[in-house]
Design a protein with these regions (language model features):
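Bacterial Sec-dependent N-terminal signal peptides
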Residues: 1-22
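Extracellular/lumen-exposed scaffold segments
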Residues: 18-150
Length: 150
């Protein structure tokens, strides 16, 4: 009976360990006031060692899914330009497969400049989609909802 209980316990622990979700990127969101009505919305990706997060802009031969941002319309906010990337971009190339990618390791900051139309407090809301890979595998794309107070 003890052997059966031990075997079941080992099996359950084994299944639990294999079912763990890998999440090699953590996100933080904030806003920085630039002037009276101008803010920078900052989306910071902290990437675990050995993993890569893909840039929004990829070469033509890339198969990686680029990071993308989709902001909800807000009558109190104007979006000023595109999301900028601040970090050390790496250009990856695999000549055997004939593919390349623009990617980040460790940390990258995505910045969207916005202008308030009035004095009311509001949030920038939306979602981001990204994919991460290491040298052995790529994880399926993930979507993260965001809400950032201005």
């Amino acid at each position: 009976m003890k052997k059966l209980t031990l075997a079941l316990a080992v099996m359950i622990i084994g299944f639990g360990a294999s079912a763990q979700v890998l999440n090699p990127v953590s996100w933080t969101f904030s806003s920085k006031k630039i002037s009276d009505k101008v803010y920078e919305v900052q989306m910071v990706a902290t990437i675990q060692s050995g993993w890569h997060l893909y840039s929004q802009v990829q070469p033509d031969d890339a198969i990686a899914i680029p990071t993308s941002f989709s902001f909800n319309q807000n009558p109190l906010v104007d979006f000023d330009g595109k999301v900028k990337e601040v970090g050390k971009m790496q250009k990856y190339s695999d000549k055997k497969l004939g593919v390349s990618a623009n990617q980040y390791s460790n940390k990258v900051v995505f910045i969207q400049r916005v202008k308030l139309k009035g004095k009311a407090k509001t949030n920038v809301t939306g979602k981001l989609e990204y994919q991460t890979c290491n040298d052995e595998k790529c994880l399926p794309p993930k979507t993260v909802n965001l809400s950032i107070a201005l």
